[in-house]
Amino acid sequence: MAQVYNFSSGPAMLPAEVLKLAQQELCDWHGLGTSVMEISHRGKEFIQVAEEAEQDFRSLLNIPSNYKVLFCHGGGRGQFAGIPLNILGDKNVADYVDAGYWAASAVKEAKKYCAPNVIDAKITVDGKRAVTPMSEWQLTPGAAYLHYCPNETIDGIAIDDTPNFGDDVIVAADFSSTILSREIDVNRFGVIYAGAQKNIGPAGLTLVIVREDLLGKASVACPSILDYTVLSENDSMFNTPPTFAWYLAGLVFKWLKQQGGVAAMDKINQQKAELLYGVIDNSGFYRNDVAQANRSRMNVPFQLADSALDKLFLEESFAAGLHALKGHRVVGGMRASIYNAMPLDGVKALTDFMLDFERRHG
């Protein structure tokens, strides 16, 4: 079978080694004669899977001991509600930074539970889309928390600054599309959450990292399945968790450790992004409209000089084994999502195709 590279924004490409191991173990996991999907989440066999996955995740991100790690249902959108329902306490105002589509979606959900103060961070620099520097965000004194999205998959915008607002500001962040792709200081955050379907594993699982002192503040209206305290007290097994997704996430964590951990992935991701943006920037045929300081290393949107060629580009790229390059309907054009599982060879294959397509149609 010819090599295929999947540039989908999510559900996204998984490491080939992980898929092969899961395939080998699918029908007879660890000699039990059953699949890992079929065993009890409360049995000792799966408890070991769950504990190892959490330990490896903690190791990869150097998560301090005073933070809980929760394996949840509901996706990122579930946490759009989970954050205010758990963190507001007796306050009604929270700061929300709007830098793109997903940040705006979080604001929309938050309005059901509080009065979000929206900080519009979208700016233009030299004709390119950018984000107001974090140091210039105007926060509300006494706000319950500050929420932002470090990586916007649709807009191709990243906020890589490290929060430094003081101990009195609780920072909540949606790391769904950038978790484990670069090193972060977890101590700077009160809550970090991430849907699994980009850099962790398959869809259906969401990870939450929450500082222990923020537990016990949930609204009485908070559903138990979103209550961080309930989930923590039950080791993320208040109800039956997405066990197969949890198992696959554990395999991905072990794969990441074998690659050298997050620091090694950070370097590889930088190489991949530089290669792809380099071809775009040095071409009169392709363009990206995000300022360099805010370009995403995970999601690279680009336009062709002539949109009439979009359909042909997608047809030819698919035939060449380069799949899921169509841009989001909101922005159009193309988008290459190059998460951790995308090898450098995959990006090289894409850039080689782009240069060849330009030679033939430019």
Swiss-Prot record:
PROSITE patterns reported for this sequence: AA_TRANSFER_CLASS_5
Cofactor needs: pyridoxal 5'-phosphate
UniProt enzyme class: transferase
Main location: cytoplasm
GO BP terms: L-serine biosynthetic process; pyridoxine biosynthetic process
Cofactor binding: number and manner: Binds 1 pyridoxal phosphate per subunit.
One Pfam family it belongs to: Aminotran_5
Molecular function terms, GO-annotated: O-phospho-L-serine:2-oxoglutarate aminotransferase activity; pyridoxal phosphate binding
Reaction(s) catalysed by this chain's protein: O-phospho-L-serine + 2-oxoglutarate = 3-phosphooxypyruvate + L-glutamate; 4-(phosphooxy)-L-threonine + 2-oxoglutarate = (R)-3-hydroxy-2-oxo-4-phosphooxybutanoate + L-glutamate
Modified residues (N6-(pyridoxal phosphate)lysine): 198
Gene3D superfamilies recorded: Aspartate Aminotransferase, domain 1 (3.90.1150.10), Type I PLP-dependent aspartate aminotransferase-like (Major domain) (3.40.640.10)
Record keywords: Amino-acid biosynthesis, Aminotransferase, Cytoplasm, Pyridoxal phosphate, Pyridoxine biosynthesis, Serine biosynthesis, Transferase
Protein EC: 2.6.1.52
Keyword RNA-binding among UniProt keywords: no
Source organism superkingdom: Bacteria
Binding site for L-glutamate: 9, 42
Subcellular location(s) per record: Cytoplasm
Pathway: Amino-acid biosynthesis; L-serine biosynthesis; L-serine from 3-phospho-D-glycerate: step 2/3; Cofactor biosynthesis; pyridoxine 5'-phosphate biosynthesis; pyridoxine 5'-phosphate from D-erythrose 4-phosphate: step 3/5
Residues bound to pyridoxal 5'-phosphate: 76-77, 102, 153, 174, 197, 239-240
GO CC field: cytoplasm
NCBIfam families the record matches: PRK05355.1 (NF003764), serC_1 (TIGR01364)
Binding partners and assembly: Homodimer.
Protein family per UniProt: Belongs to the class-V pyridoxal-phosphate-dependent aminotransferase family. SerC subfamily.
Protein's job: Catalyzes the reversible conversion of 3-phosphohydroxypyruvate to phosphoserine and of 3-hydroxy-2-oxo-4-phosphonooxybutanoate to phosphohydroxythreonine.
Protein name as it appears in the record: Phosphoserine aminotransferase
Organism: Klebsiella pneumoniae (strain 342)
